[in-house]
């Protein structure tokens, strides 16, 4: 059985966010680096560092938390894996879904690389819907 690195990233970030952890350590691959760059650019995470340990590279993500008067921290990150190895979901540029009216983002794997739904609509290309983030 294969390893689903995108689901591992999503699960690690979601668990750290629910447990109010400040940092997450994930394996560094080309796909994970592309997804993390999108998360950083869209403001869902604060910082990314690349760490080397025993000839293996890891990404250390610093999560963004919002303070609330009633609670000490409020989680602001919701992630959902859409396309998975057993069931691939594809969409053309006209049918890419909008998450919460454009507040959330859809991460797509296209022929021109991994990008957000807005970038794919501007370039008028479709692809595999990897995950929703809001």
Curated annotation (Swiss-Prot):
Q: Where in the cell is it found?
A: Plastid, Chloroplast
> What does the entry list under GO cellular component?
chloroplast; ribonucleoprotein complex; ribosome
UniProt GO molecular function: rRNA binding; structural constituent of ribosome
**Where is the major localization of this protein?**
plastid
InterPro entries xrefs: Ribosomal_uS8, Ribosomal_uS8_CS, Ribosomal_uS8_sf
User: Keyword RNA-binding on this protein?
Assistant: yes
Q: Does the keyword Thylakoid apply?
A: no
Q: What superkingdom heads the lineage? A: Eukaryota
Keywords, sorted A to Z: Chloroplast, Plastid, Ribonucleoprotein, Ribosomal protein, RNA-binding, rRNA-binding
GO biological process, any: translation
Q: What does this protein do?
A: One of the primary rRNA binding proteins, it binds directly to 16S rRNA central domain where it helps coordinate assembly of the platform of the 30S subunit.
Q: How does it assemble?
A: Part of the 30S ribosomal subunit.
Q: Which family does it belong to?
A: Belongs to the universal ribosomal protein uS8 family.
Name the record gives this protein:
Small ribosomal subunit protein uS8c
Supply the source organism for this entry.
Answer: Arabis hirsuta
Q: What is the lineage of its organism?
A: Eukaryota, Viridiplantae, Streptophyta, Embryophyta, Tracheophyta
Q: Which gene encodes it?
A: rps8
């Amino acid at each position: 059985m294969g390893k689903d690195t995108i689901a591992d990233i999503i699960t690690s970030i979601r668990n750290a966010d629910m447990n109010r952890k400040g940092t997450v350590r994930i394996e560094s691959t080309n796909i994970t680096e592309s997804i993390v760059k999108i998360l950083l650019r869209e403001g869902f995470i604060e910082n990314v560092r690349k760490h080397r340990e025993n000839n293996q590279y890891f990404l250390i993500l610093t999560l963004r938390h919002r303070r609330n008067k009633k609670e000490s921290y409020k989680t602001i990150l919701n992630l959902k894996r859409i396309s998975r190895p057993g069931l691939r979901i594809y969409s053309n540029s006209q049918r890419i879904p909008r998450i919460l009216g454009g507040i959330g983002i859809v991460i797509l794997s296209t022929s021109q690389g991994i990008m957000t739904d807005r970038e794919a609509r501007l370039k008028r290309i479709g692809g595999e819907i990897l995950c929703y983030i809001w």
